[in-house]
């Protein structure tokens, strides 16, 4: 399994399964033979829906696809973004690779109808979901080779994206690092 498929699959266990399966528009792909097996793997994912309050899954870096997906969502979503791949080589010619993974739990407001107290409560709920994800990841670090390669955040930041249906929530960034990951 490639690095991005591994990231996609691991974090797919947190939102409701139906919200993850919405990302698959086909039963198979003419361009990518692994598509059908990835869909089967996600369908059979166990455990799944670990945080039932997170209804949808958004994954990727393409701004237009992300924007379109979030416009279709009502309720809280988990948005997984990735990037900034770095490779370094030490004196012994061992290559260490790192990739940043941003996890955002947010809710699109579509039309800002919440008062300031409701906004605080919504932000509190998103932060709670993100902290639940982090707690599960820490538990998984004992047995999951994928999670063992993650460094946990020292900073969790507020997320407000007007261009994403006025989504509001919280983001944490983790780093996956290891010898010859890529």
Which residues does each predicted region cover?
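Short, solvent-exposed beta-strand/turn "edge" segments of beta-rich domains on protein surfaces
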Residues: 70, 88-96, 161-167
């Amino acid at each position: 399994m490639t690095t991005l498929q591994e990231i996609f699959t691991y974090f797919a266990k947190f939102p409701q399964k139906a919200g993850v399966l919405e990302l698959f528009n086909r039963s198979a792909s003419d361009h990518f033979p692994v598509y059908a097996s990835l869909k089967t793997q996600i369908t059979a994912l166990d455990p799944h829906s670990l945080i039932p309050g997170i209804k949808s899954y958004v994954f990727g870096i393409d701004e237009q696809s992300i924007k379109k997906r979030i416009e279709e969502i009502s309720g809280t979503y988990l948005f997984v973004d990735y990037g900034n791949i770095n490779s370094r080589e030490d004196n012994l010619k061992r290559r260490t690779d790192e990739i940043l993974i941003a996890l955002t739990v947010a809710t699109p407001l579509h039309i800002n109808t919440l008062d300031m107290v409701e906004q605080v409560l919504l932000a509190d709920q998103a932060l709670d979901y993100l902290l639940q994800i982090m707690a599960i990841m820490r538990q998984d670090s004992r047995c999951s080779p994928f999670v063992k390669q993650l460094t946990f955040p020292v900073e969790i930041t507020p997320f407000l994206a007007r261009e994403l249906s006025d989504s509001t929530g919280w983001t944490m960034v983790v780093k996956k690092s290891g010898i010859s990951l890529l």
